[in-house]
Every structure is written in C-alpha cells, then in structure tokens.
Regions:
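A general "terminal functional-core" signal
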Residues: 2-43, 47-54, 59-68, 75-84, ...
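Short glycine-rich His-centered loop
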Residues: 85-105
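Short internal beta-strands
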Residues: 89-91, 131, 271-273
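Short catalytic helix/loop segments, enriched in acidic residues and glycine
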Residues: 105-121, 350
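Short, glycine/charge-rich beta-strand/loop segments that flank catalytic centers
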Residues: 131-140, 207-211
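Charged, often glycine-rich, active-site loop that binds/positions anionic groups
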Residues: 134-159
Length: 399
C-alpha cells in the first residue's frame, strides 16, 4: 500500500526560491562570461591594431631611413679631390647678384668671393688650389628636407619670406631659383663636401654655408637649406662617423639644426648666442646640450672667457669624431643685428681657440662662415684664416 507525501507550503516556497536563485545565478554567470568574452575579444583586436600600427610605424621609419641612406650613397657630392688642392671650398656661384635687390638685405651677399680675393692677394691661397663643389640636387636635399618644404620654395612669396626681402615676392620664381636658390644649393654642396675633406685632411673650410636657421621642414633668417644637418647625415653614412659636435658661435641661435637633431644622442650642440635677438625659438633651445648666452653689449674678453669655459665643459661631456664649427662674424662690434661688441682681433682669437681645441684632440673640423652683416666681415674672416695658416693650424700651401 503506497502513501503519497504532500509537501508543505514552506517546502514549496523554499524550492521555488532555490530554483529561482539558480536561474538568476546561471543567467548572471552567462552575462558575465559573455561580457568577459567581448572584453577579451575587443582587447585582442585593439592589441592587434596597436601592434599592426606599431609595426607599420616601425616599418615606415625603417623604410624612410633606408631611403635616406640610399640617397646619400647615390649622391655625387663627395668628389675625389686631388692632393694638389687645399681643403678650402668656394665657387663663384656662391655670390648673389640680383639686379641690386640683394642690397635690400643687410647681409653682404658678395662676401664669399671677397674673402677668397683677400686670401689670394695675401698669397696665402693659390686660386688653382681652391676646391669647387657641385650643386646639391633635389635628391640630396631630400636627405633632410621634406618634399612639401622643397615644393614651397617654388612660391616666390615663400622665398621672399625666408630671405627677408619682401620685394622679391614680385619676381617670377624661375628667376629666384637661378639668382638666389642656385647659389645657396652650391654652398650646401660645399658644406657637405667639407666633412669628407676634413676627415681626409684634418680640416676644411667652406667659404660659405652655415645656414643654421633652416631645418628639414622650415626655412628663415636668410637660410633656405639645412646644410649643417645635411653635412652631418652624409658623414654618418659615408664617413662611418657616429658622434658629431656642433660649435655654433654665430650671434644668433642655431634653431634649425637644433630642431633637426632634437634628442639625437649622436650630436652634441654647443650654442653661444645672444638671447635678445632673432629667432627667439624657445622650443629649439630645449635641445641645446650646452647653452651659453651672451647678451647685447658683451665685450671681447668676457666673450672669450665664456668660450674657453664652454669648450672645457663640452670635451668633458662628449667625445666627437667630427666638429662642425659655425663661425659667424655677426658678433663683431658694430653689427646691428648681432648687437655684441667683439673686436676683429677677438674673432681671430676665437677661431684660433676652436681650431686649437680640435687639433689638440686630433678631431677633424669643418668651418662655415655663416652670418655677418658688415662689409668688414669679409676682411675679418680672411685675416682670421691667414692667422690659422701662420699658426700652422691649417695648411693652405700646395703639397
């Protein structure tokens, strides 16, 4: 005989609650697992996207470096210079003559030829011994410059802005290419070649160049091409050099090369400049390894003492395989743009100190003439080179 047990209402309620709780927990677990799955999937996709982006960025960077290297290796600017020539580089194409318009800028655009003329007259240099460079091609310029920047130079207004002569904007660009930019490109070729000659002979002087306000993507201050940056990149690839010191003693801050080599540990920048004048580039100042400020009115003795101290600090911090010396003469007393009070003899002593610094440590040195806005600059530069020759810091005689 069977007996059926009828559950009490309490048991029924408990069972219903338990079943409901199980359903809720199961549903919640399902929702959490679904959410977790979506989160993992989304993170996986993001990770893949980031890795793909990073990989693409790395690949793009490697491609750009490879292209830069190929451009440098295919360049014709590294001429084989016979030993009958001295490592002093100049071409008559350096000088700018443009219907008198060049006189609207305070820069002496014929100083380069006048420097060589003084050296020849002083019998320190034989005209036949001067090295003539090639013009930097577009492919050469693309080693540092962007295509966009080079294309911007096809606009006369842009060129006028860079060389700071507003009326030039009214001229056809083809004229500016021939009369202004062509001379600049020849000087760029000279600066690039100077590094090769310095490595071979111990020193080289480009009687031109030093366009230190121009970076890869921006020109200004009478500087249309970044010859210093180009020179250094060529040296990295063609000369197997890995450490370069820039000693920039122009009165103005060298903001162009500072931006190009921002955070590049291969390049040490010593920049001694007047902070009260153009270009007021505070971002670029962050990338100067040793900043030496010389305010308006600084005199010769004070200047030379600061230079001596700066050179000692530099060599104690960095061991260069090449020095690029930007030897602007706009520090001369009377130069309205530099606003310093350095005597002509002070310039001679300054250059001697820098060349002695390089010679004592057996470091190849490239000298660029850079800025200088007085007619007397050409004579001062020539006299300084004569002094370097007399002190046997350079040899301008034929072998």
């Amino acid at each position: 005989m069977s007996c059926r047990v009828i559950p009490s209402s309490t048991d029924f309620t408990r069972n219903l609650y338990t079943a409901t709780l199980v359903c809720v927990i199961s549903f919640a677990t399902f929702q959490v697992s679904q959410s977790l799955y979506r989160h993992i999937l989304r993170n996986s996709r993001n990770r893949h996207r980031i890795m793909s982006s990073s990989s693409a960025s790395s690949s793009s960077k490697n491609d750009a470096e490879s292209l830069r290297c190929n451009r440098i290796l295919s360049s014709k600017l590294y001429l084989d210079v016979p030993t009958s020539k001295v490592p002093l580089i100049y071409s008559p194409t350096y000088d700018i003559s443009f219907l008198g318009v060049e006189k609207l800028h305070p820069f002496d655009s014929s100083k380069w030829g006048r420097i060589c003329g003084f050296l020849i007259a002083a019998r320190v240099l034989d005209k036949k011994c001067i090295v003539e460079p090639l013009e930097a091609s577009k492919n050469d310029l693309l080693v540092v410059h962007t295509e966009q920047y080079l294309n911007s130079l096809k606009n006369s207004t842009k060129v006028a802005e860079i060389i700071e002569v507003p009326p030039v904007a009214l001229f056809p660009n083809c004229l500016l290419q021939q009369k202004v930019l062509y001379p600049f490109r020849n000087q760029v070729g000279g600066t690039i070649l100077a590094a090769k000659l310095a490595k071979e002979r111990g020193w080289a002087i480009n009687v031109g160049g030093g366009f230190h306000h121009c970076s890869g993507g921006k020109g200004g201050g009478f500087c249309a091409y970044a010859d210093i940056s180009l020179c250094i990149h060529f040296a990295f690839v063609r000369l197997n050099i890995s450490r370069v010191m820039i000693i920039d003693l122009d009165a103005h801050q060298g903001n162009g090369h500072e931006m190009d080599f921002a955070r590049d540990s291969r390049v040490y920048i010593l920049d001694m400049f007047n902070p009260e004048i153009y270009p007021f580039d505070y971002e670029a100042r962050r990338y100067i390894d040793q900043k030496v400020e010389v305010v308006s009115g600084t005199t010769t003795n004070v200047y030379l003492k600061k230079l001596e101290e700066a050179l000692e600090v530099a060599i104690g911090t960095f061991d260069p395989e090449l020095i690029v010396y930007n030897a602007g003469t706009d520090i001369l007393d009377g130069d309205s743009l530099g606003r310093l009070k350095i005597s002509p003899d002070g310039i001679t002593t300054r250059d001697e100190k820098v060349f002695s610094f390089a010679r004592e440590r057996n470091i190849p040195i490239v000298m660029l003439t850079s800025g200088g806005y007085m007619k007397s600059s050409a004579r001062v530069i020539a006299d300084s080179i004569v002094n370097l020759s007399k002190k046997r810091l350079i040899d301008t005689t034929k072998p």
